[in-house]
Amino acid sequence: MILLIDVGNTNIVLGIHDNEKYIASWRISTDSKKTSDEYSIQVMQLFNQAKLNPEDVEGIIISSVVPNIMHSLENMVRKCFCKEPIVVGPGIKTGINIKYDNPKEVGADRIVNAVAAFEKHKKPMIIIDFGTATTFCAITEKGDYLGGNICPGIQISADALFERAAKLPRIELEKPKSVICKNTVTSMQAGIIYGYIGKVEYIVKRMKKEMMDLGEKEPFVLATGGLAKLVYSETDVIDEVDRKLTLEGLKILYEKNKE
């Protein structure tokens, strides 16, 4: 039984993989103020609720984009499972060739997604991860990680509009039926959501052209993250949504790096 931990800016996703399938997954809030003891209590409660025995965990792997939380999480792993976790970072075996100017700058989440996408599809790809930030990554058919781009996530865009425009309210991210709206709330929803979809479509179009100019076949576009399905339902530039892409990548990296 393998424990997979994906630490994002907003949430931590934990998954349990056993006998070639996922048997449990949880989402908890990312909180850098929590101690290792607090995380230990929370994780043990999740295991108890799922009727899982911590002693059955053979290994743990962690991917994190929040450096100041790692001390607490690594200590939690040692306390709860009496094991050293594998941490995604410089020196880890990935099976892909990172073509970034400084490979150490590539976020762990982007590496994990790229590994999963390449291992599963073996074709030129654009990977979009709709998280707190939205990331776009380009992978060649040979497994070269060419790079990509990062932009504010949909929720960040909504929060910024509320915080910087005095008369605009905080809104729920719901998709209105029209882009010609007749009240403030739906006008904001339309501008944020449909404007965001337009941004995704342009970036994908531009990335496809640049990759094909390098001699790649037309890339397959794979999306993951919390709002992937919302965007997918409104555009034809995304070929597939894979909600478990990051957990799949962590499992692959664990197998490549376990002793």
Swiss-Prot record:
EC primary class: transferase
Catalytic function, reaction form: (R)-pantothenate + ATP = (R)-4'-phosphopantothenate + ADP + H(+)
E.C. code: 2.7.1.33
InterPro entries cross-referenced by the UniProt entry: ATPase_NBD, Type_III_PanK
CDD domains assigned to the protein according to its UniProt record, in alphabetical order: ASKHA_NBD_PanK-III
Gene Ontology CC, one term: cytoplasm
One annotated GO molecular function: pantothenate kinase activity
Binding of substrate, residues: 100, 107-110, 184
Bound cofactor: record note: A monovalent cation. Ammonium or potassium.
Active site feature: 109 (proton acceptor)
SUPFAM superfamilies in the record: Actin-like ATPase domain
Top-level taxon of the source organism: Bacteria
Chain residues that bind ATP: 6-13, 132
Keyword Ion transport attributed: no
Pathway the protein acts in: Cofactor biosynthesis; coenzyme A biosynthesis; CoA from (R)-pantothenate: step 1/5
Cofactor: NH4(+); K(+)
Cellular localisation: Cytoplasm
Recorded coiled-coil stretches: none
Keyword tags: ATP-binding, Coenzyme A biosynthesis, Cytoplasm, Kinase, Metal-binding, Nucleotide-binding, Potassium, Transferase
GO biological process: coenzyme A biosynthetic process
PANTHER family: TYPE III PANTOTHENATE KINASE
Family per similarity comment: Belongs to the type III pantothenate kinase family.
Function: Catalyzes the phosphorylation of pantothenate (Pan), the first step in CoA biosynthesis.
Listed name of the protein: Type III pantothenate kinase
Species assigned in the record: Clostridium perfringens (strain 13 / Type A)
Gene that this sequence comes from: coaX
